[in-house]
Curated annotation (Swiss-Prot):
Belongs to the complex I 23 kDa subunit family. It comes from Streptomyces avermitilis (strain ATCC 31267 / DSM 46492 / JCM 5070 / NBRC 14893 / NCIMB 12804 / NRRL 8165 / MA-4680). InterPro entries: 4Fe4S_Fe-S-bd (IPR017896), 4Fe4S_Fe_S_CS (IPR017900), NADH_quinone_OxRdtase_chainI (IPR010226). Its main location: membrane. Residues 172-209 have a biased composition (Low complexity). This is NADH-quinone oxidoreductase subunit I 2. Its EC number is 7.1.1.-. It catalyses: a quinone + NADH + 5 H(+)(in) = a quinol + NAD(+) + 4 H(+)(out).
Amino acid sequence: MAPIPGSGLAKGLAVTLRTMTKKTVTAQYPDAQPELPPRSRGVIGLFEENCTVCMLCARECPDWCIYIDSHKETVPPAAPGGRERSRNVLDRFAIDFSLCMYCGICIEVCPFDALFWSPEFEYAETDIHELTHERDKLREWMWTVPAPPALDPAAEEPKEIAAARKTAEKLAAAQAAAAQTDAAQAEAAQAEAAAEAGSAAEGAPDAAPKPQEGEA
């Protein structure tokens, strides 16, 4: 049987009429902010204090959108008799988000936890050059990085936390030992000063010497 002319249009209008009577489900962005899933990839934040300028992130980036400049400085020895050493100092760290494809390789390969994902995605610009975020802007994104999920109570303690705790305990023990040594030295100095004062008092001549025999 040949289809009735206009039946397809009628079916389409029927679907439209049924949909018009239902409640809308469209999220009116930006009036209603979306609920992002965990581990959303929005923008990359830089924790500059952890960066050692190893250049690993820039070398592994497939888009070559990470720009790093640095210089070397000489650090004096930490202890007397030690040797000076040189270290890299970060001058520039920038990411061009107009080239970035958000693969996350730079975050994965960073051995010092200096790069993190932030769920923030509202950084559109009218000028493409503004999408190159320098280290000050990347630091601002760092404060929008969500806290890591809580550890499972039955899980083993991470080795980084265990190492940090051991280091803190050693430092506290060294400080306590140094304080005890200082206190003992202070007590010894006080005792020595008191002994010297007593010896000086015993050896001092009397204020009124006795007259010798034959003197009036």
